[in-house]
Amino acid sequence: MSIVDTLLLLLILATALGCGLMGGLFFAFSNFVMTALERIPEQSAVTAMQSINKVVLNRLFLALFLGTAATSIGLLFWAYQRWPLPGSLCMAIGSALYLAGNIVVTLLFNVPKNQALARLDPASSEAAAAWHRYVPSWNRWNHVRTITALAAAAWLMAALWLARP
């Protein structure tokens, strides 16, 4: 196996793991974090979500979230260069799923909702009403992120299998 083949397999593996980790994180929010927040008073839920949205912006999360985007972009280019070799289509689909379903969805839908929530005083009646609008919409887009991240991981694992020498 050439060094280029080895590097490609490592890049696919790293990207698949990143997608899987992000999918797991989003799954946790879809499965129980948001449900738990819905069970507590609105003021506490808004305060908790505001805190989560601040704390999540840390080096480790950003390295995983953006690093997976960077490796996905790299795989898109690599898939184009290798076309139509085995695994190229799976690499392209997996990478595109992560970029569209996680990066684009996060930037266009979840982040603006989080920013709007951050501007609210949790003790206000406006915050309570906003919370009831925020949760269903935020969850919907988070489900999209969960499904696309896990699907991207699956496509990339298929690419890993198909691209092996």
What are these regions (language model features)?
Residues 5-19, 80-100:
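Interfacial segments of alpha-helical transmembrane regions
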Residues 21-66, 112-136:
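Interfacial loop at the N-terminal end of multi-pass membrane proteins
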Residues 64-75, 146-154:
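Core segments of transmembrane alpha-helices
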Residues 92-111, 115-119:
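Acidic/histidine-rich alpha-helical segments that form the ligand environment
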Residues 135-150:
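Hydrophobic alpha-helical transmembrane segments
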Residues 158-165:
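Juxtamembrane boundary at the C-terminal end of a transmembrane helix
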